[in-house]
């Protein structure tokens, strides 16, 4: 995924910042505790496609 794209993307729910996971498979919104998938380098920014972060992921800094 292009780093410039990450600079302009925001969470579709709270409009907060997103963080790309180390394996580049998800975009994380800590505020909403959601992980949006990245498929073939394309972020899927639909709430219905996001998964809820588990407790350990929520506490991970």
Swiss-Prot record:
InterPro entries: Trm112-like. Disulfide bonds: none annotated. GO terms for cellular component: cytosol. Pfam families: Trm112p. Belongs to the UPF0434 family. This is UPF0434 protein Avin_14770. It comes from Azotobacter vinelandii (strain DJ / ATCC BAA-1303).
